[in-house]
């Protein structure tokens, strides 16, 4: 599976890949991106599912890792929903970058 991730550089700039259809991020990548701990991220994911914003079959995928374990991967719509659900400086930076790239594409 080819996938892209949203990254932050050492200066706090967010890099969003142009191929948004292949953006899938795992829990640790989201924890680092938003600057939260794993239980906070899991609670936000549960809250998004509880509000019935997304069906888990649409926003989540489980892939098998080379070591035999499985990892949950979250699609771009879930990443966007989490960015607006979580209240941290990392999430605010992601929100601003997403809105900026959205407005830039319309022009």
Give the ranges of each region predicted by the language model.
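Positively charged, aromatic-accented nucleic-acid-binding surfaces
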Residues: 1-36, 63-107
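Residues at alpha-helix termini
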Residues: 34, 51-52
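Key DNA-contact positions within bacterial/archaeal DNA-binding proteins
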Residues: 39-43
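DNA major-groove recognition helix of helix-turn-helix
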Residues: 45, 49
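Short, charged/polar low-complexity linear motifs in solvent-exposed/disordered segments
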Residues: 50-51, 99
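Short Lys/Arg-enriched helix C-cap and helix-to-coil transition segments
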Residues: 53-67
């Amino acid at each position: 599976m080819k996938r892209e991730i949203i990254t932050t550089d050492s200066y706090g700039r967010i890099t969003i890949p142009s191929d948004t259809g292949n953006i899938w991020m795992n829990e640790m990548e989201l924890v680092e991106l938003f600057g939260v701990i794993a239980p906070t991220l899991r609670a936000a994911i549960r809250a998004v599912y509880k509000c019935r914003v997304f069906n888990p079959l649409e926003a989540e995928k489980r892939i098998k890792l080379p070591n035999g374990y499985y990892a949950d991967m979250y699609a771009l719509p879930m990443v966007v929903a989490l960015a607006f659900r979580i209240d941290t400086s990392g999430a605010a930076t992601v929100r601003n970058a997403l809105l900026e790239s959205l407005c830039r594409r319309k022009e």
